[in-house]
């Protein structure tokens, strides 16, 4: 009995020490219900990841903020309807891209240098506000001059609701007292997969910038452009040209109508309410339009476009009718129909 008591006491001490050592890295915006990162010396460096999905795509963004508060990311793209060999339940095309879109820009003829992250928030999309600077012509003593702040760039990453692509928007704001020139270049990056490893032969994974051009931006003003990361079959398909701004509007409409429009949890604890809201987003977005109909998949770079037994039938399917979520209801009914084909009489 005494040994048991000592063990319990030890576990309680460890739990107390662990709780004390944990840092609060996020706060809840009471007006938008977004979660916002606390950027301080106590919370950085920081690394994290988040998965978001649409009917034809899923992606995991692995992102990091280093000691200088600079943001970097790696995109792990998943295309559940582009099947690989062996064509089993895990046979989704997957590809990682670390393309740094901002590094491709020209600001007054110079490459922008990141000077730190000002804000990180999540609310149906990952939004990062960072400051960038430029130096001067690299001659003589100018080599030693630190870059001067020139632009503030707001990055927003999110999935298309219906297309096989991850979308990104970039807002470039002039934070100087003079007019600057920003060049958004034409840019296409393609990768072709091994035809022997694809059910439909080779697949093309493509990154592209939309809204390129040369822009003069007055003080306090901004411009916007977009980028998308997509995949398609080489044999009989072509790259899509999305309206990235419209895709963002569709994503936010889904959050507003399907998530915030029904089954809203209200308790004395805002953290619990927010956890439930984000759980609704993840549960309801992760539904894929397969050849066999709409199917829910837990994700995690492993579980897509298939029947995952109790994950669907027991855990998530009963939620959708309470949400009034039609796509979820359709995927639930489809799941049970597939189950019925294998049930005993």
What is the predicted role of each segment?
Residues 14, 148, 162-163, 295, ...:
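Generic secretory/membrane-interface signal
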Residues 3, 17, 248, 277-279:
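Short alpha-helical segments used as structural interaction elements across diverse proteins
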Residues 9-12, 16, 81, 89, ...:
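A periodicity- and composition-biased signal for non-globular, repetitive helical segments
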Residues 21-274, 324-328:
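Terminal accessory carbohydrate-recognition/targeting modules of carbohydrate-active enzymes
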Residues 256-345:
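Substrate-binding groove/exosite segments of carbohydrate-active enzymes
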Residues 1-23:
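Bacterial Sec-dependent N-terminal signal peptides
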Residues 7-10, 172, 315:
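Short amphipathic alpha-helical "recognition" segments used for binding
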């Amino acid at each position: 009995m005494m040994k048991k008591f000592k063990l319990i006491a030890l576990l309680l001490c460890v739990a107390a020490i662990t709780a004390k050592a944990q840092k609060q890295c996020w706060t809840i915006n009471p007006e938008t219900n977004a979660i916002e990162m606390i950027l301080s010396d106590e919370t950085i460096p920081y690394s994290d990841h988040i998965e978001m999905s649409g009917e034809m795509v899923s992606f995991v963004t692995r992102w990091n903020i280093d000691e200088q508060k600079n943001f970097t990311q790696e995109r792990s793209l998943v295309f559940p309807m582009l099947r690989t060999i062996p064509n089993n339940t895990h046979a989704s095309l997957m590809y990682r891209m670390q393309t740094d879109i901002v590094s491709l820009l020209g600001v007054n003829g110079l490459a922008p240098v990141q000077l730190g992250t000002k804000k990180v928030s999540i609310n149906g999309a990952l939004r990062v506000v960072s400051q960038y600077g430029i130096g001067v012509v690299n001659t003589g003593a100018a080599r030693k001059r630190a870059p001067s702040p020139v632009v503030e760039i707001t990055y927003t990453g999110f999935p298309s609701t219906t297309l096989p692509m991850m979308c990104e928007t970039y807002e470039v704001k002039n934070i100087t007292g003079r007019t600057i020139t920003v060049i958004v270049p034409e840019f296409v990056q393609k990768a072709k997969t091994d035809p022997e490893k694809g059910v439909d032969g080779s697949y093309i994974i493509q990154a592209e910038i939309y809204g390129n051009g040369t822009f003069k931006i007055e003080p306090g003003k901004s411009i916007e452009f977009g980028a998308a990361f997509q995949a398609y079959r080489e044999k009989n398909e072509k790259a899509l040209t999305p309206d990235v701004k419209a895709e963002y509007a569709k994503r936010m409409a889904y959050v507003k109508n399907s998530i915030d429009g029904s089954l809203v949890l209200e308790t004395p604890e805002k953290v619990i309410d927010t956890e439930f809201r984000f759980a609704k987003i993840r549960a309801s977005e992760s539904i894929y339009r397969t050849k066999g109909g709409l199917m829910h998949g837990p994700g995690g770079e492993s579980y897509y476009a298939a029947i995952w037994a109790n994950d669907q039938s027991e855990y998530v399917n009963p939620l959708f009718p309470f949400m009034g979520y039609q796509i979820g209801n359709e995927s639930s009914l489809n799941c049970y129909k597939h189950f019925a084909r294998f049930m005993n009489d």
